[in-house]
Amino acid sequence: MSKVIEINHPLILHKLAILRDEKTGSKDFRKLVEEISMLMAYEVTRDLNTEEVEVKTPVAVTKCKMLSGKKMAVVPILRAGLGMVDGVLNLIPAAKVGHIGLYRDEKTLQPVEYFCKMPQDIAERDIIVVDPMLATGGSAIDALTMLKNRGAKNLKLMCLVGAPEGIEAIKKAHDDVDIYLASIDEKLNEHGYIVPGLGDAGDRLFGTK
């Protein structure tokens, strides 16, 4: 059963408040998304495996812990997910980066993949899928399905803000994927926007409309 983890660290809450403000421009918005993503990644990676190693310091030989087990990958959902990548890489610089681009066919409402580029060994990696907004959950569900179809098994979803509707949709479709959020917001409005949300994260990141 998937877990839903709301990371309410004071630094995240402070930065998220500035991020939400409609007066925050694209330059500051990008920086805040990166900073919050790095802080969240600390919690998302809390359960990574470690092994004991011997290290010689300038003073003595000692036992230390280092990461062991699977390599990692971060996979942004285009385009807004790109804003979260550097924050994760600041903490996990050795992680590989894959990209997933999706849109929905207006007639069939089915997901259409327009771009997908993954590390060759993606099936063997622990994967963090990143997207600032978890609204209906449709894009995240499709992205997780695509990764599973490529053999991925250990997946986590990291979003800045999410609506209860999207969270429930993910839990129903992918009950083996844990969901990490900086905030669980109130609801979706009639246009499918998260309330209070951030507005359109992609437009605010890249200065487009």
Curated annotation (Swiss-Prot):
Cofactor note: Binds 1 Mg(2+) ion per subunit. The magnesium is bound as Mg-PRPP.
Binding site for uracil: 194, 199-201
Pathway listed: Pyrimidine metabolism; UMP biosynthesis via salvage pathway; UMP from uracil: step 1/1
UniProt keywords, alphabetically: Allosteric enzyme, Glycosyltransferase, GTP-binding, Magnesium, Nucleotide-binding, Transferase
GO molecular function: GTP binding; magnesium ion binding; uracil phosphoribosyltransferase activity
GO process terms (BP): UMP salvage; uracil salvage
Regulation: Allosterically activated by GTP.
Catalyzed reaction equations: UMP + diphosphate = 5-phospho-alpha-D-ribose 1-diphosphate + uracil
Xref: InterPro entries: PRibTrfase_dom, PRTase-like, Upp_B, UPRTase/APRTase, Ura_phspho_trans
Necessary cofactors: Mg(2+)
Residues given in the record as 5-phospho-alpha-D-ribose 1-diphosphate binding sites: 79, 104, 131-139, 200
Record keyword Acetylation present: no
Enzyme nomenclature, EC number: 2.4.2.9
Top class in the EC scheme: transferase
Pfam families: UPRTase
Function of the protein: Catalyzes the conversion of uracil and 5-phospho-alpha-D-ribose 1-diphosphate (PRPP) to UMP and diphosphate.
Family membership noted in the UniProt record: Belongs to the UPRTase family.
HAMAP family: Upp_B (MF_01218_B)
Name the record gives this protein: Uracil phosphoribosyltransferase
Organism of origin: Clostridium beijerinckii (strain ATCC 51743 / NCIMB 8052) (Clostridium acetobutylicum)
Gene (UniProt): upp
